[in-house]
């Protein structure tokens, strides 16, 4: 049985300009105290064609975590436009939130992200080189895709066994009929890389 359950992920300040930070309010519950940190990551999928373009926007350590319910706001800077292929700058991609314990990923929450020009003129005649300053980012918050992984909470030597299922506790319908791509359980998408900082539980 998993020692940590994600109760809710709320997408904050959405939609936003492309260069605005990502902000998620994450609520989770620990069935028993965890001696070590949980590591949360926000990953931006730069291209559906290759994981080479994934960007780890931030990584944060939360813990040690006492038993009970906890909430924190996870903020990460927008992706680096220079690392996104020009052909993938406009349109639909994915942002992922992952959590690991002892180096083992046990949950992944993915959202579709639609980047589009607000100006009708730019929509009809987009510039050859994407103008990120004119793009709006809209996260489809009502349709998360949740993938869970069985891990050994007491021994990180065990290998992971991935299972995908519906998380009714997140309070939204999960489109499980969609076709998984590259093992993510995410339609038309993928996952990334970067620094760590420490955050205590609230």
Curated annotation (Swiss-Prot):
Phosphoserine modification, residue list: 198
Keyword terms: Chaperone, Chromatin regulator, Cytoplasm, Nucleus, Phosphoprotein, Transcription, Transcription regulation
A GO molecular-function annotation: histone binding
Superkingdom of origin: Eukaryota
Gene3D superfamilies assigned to the protein according to its UniProt record, in alphabetical order: Histone chaperone ASF1-like
Record note on modification: Phosphorylated by TLK1 and TLK2.
Regions that span the bilayer: none
Residues covered by region (Interaction with histone H3 and CHAF1B): 1-156
Presence of keyword Cytoplasm: yes
Localisation per UniProt entry: Nucleus; Cytoplasm, Cytosol
Gene Ontology biological process terms, A to Z: blastocyst hatching; DNA replication-dependent chromatin assembly; nucleosome assembly
A Pfam family recorded for this sequence: ASF1_hist_chap
S-S bridge residues: none
Any one Gene Ontology cellular component term annotated for this protein: nucleus
Biological role: Histone chaperone that facilitates histone deposition and histone exchange and removal during nucleosome assembly and disassembly. Cooperates with chromatin assembly factor 1 (CAF-1) to promote replication-dependent chromatin assembly. Also involved in the nuclear import of the histone H3-H4 dimer together with importin-4 (IPO4): specifically recognizes and binds newly synthesized histones with the monomethylation of H3 'Lys-9' (H3K9me1) and diacetylation at 'Lys-5' and 'Lys-12' of H4 (H4K5ac and H4K12ac) marks in the cytosol.
Assembly notes: Interacts with histone H3 (via C-terminus), including histone H3.1, H3.2 and H3.3, and histone H4; the interaction with H3 is direct. Interacts with the CHAF1A, CHAF1B and RBBP4 subunits of the CAF-1 complex. Interacts with HAT1, NASP and TAF1. Found in a soluble complex with NASP and histones H3 and H4; the interaction with NASP is probably indirect and mediated by H3-H4. Interacts with CDAN1. Found in a cytosolic complex with CDAN1, ASF1A, IPO4 and histones H3.1 and H4. Interacts with CREBBP.
Family stated for the protein in its record: Belongs to the ASF1 family.
The name this protein goes by in its record: Histone chaperone ASF1B
Organism field: Bos taurus (Bovine)
């Amino acid at each position: 049985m998993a020692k940590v359950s994600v109760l809710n992920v709320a997408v904050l300040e959405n939609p936003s300009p492309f260069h605005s930070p990502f902000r998620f309010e994450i609520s989770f519950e620990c069935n028993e105290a965890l001696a070590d940190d949980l590591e949360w990551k926000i990953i931006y999928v730069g291209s559906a064609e290759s994981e080479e373009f994934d960007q780890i926007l931030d990584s944060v350590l939360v813990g040690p975590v006492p038993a009970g319910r906890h909430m924190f706001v996870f903020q990460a800077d927008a992706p680096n436009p220079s690392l996104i292929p020009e052909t993938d700058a406009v349109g639909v991609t994915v942002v992922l939130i992952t959590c690991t314990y002892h180096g083992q990923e046990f949950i992944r929450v993915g959202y579709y992200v639609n980047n589009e020009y607000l100006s009708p003129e730019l929509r009809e005649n987009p510039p050859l080189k994407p103008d990120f300053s004119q793009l709006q980012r809209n996260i489809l918050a009502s349709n998360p895709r949740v993938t869970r992984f069985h891990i050994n909470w007491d021994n990180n030597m065990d290998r992971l066994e991935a299972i995908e299922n519906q998380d009714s506790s997140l309070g939204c319908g999960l489109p499980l009929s969609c076709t998984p791509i590259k093992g993510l359980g995410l339609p038309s998408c993928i996952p990334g890389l970067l620094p760590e900082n420490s955050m205590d539980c609230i």
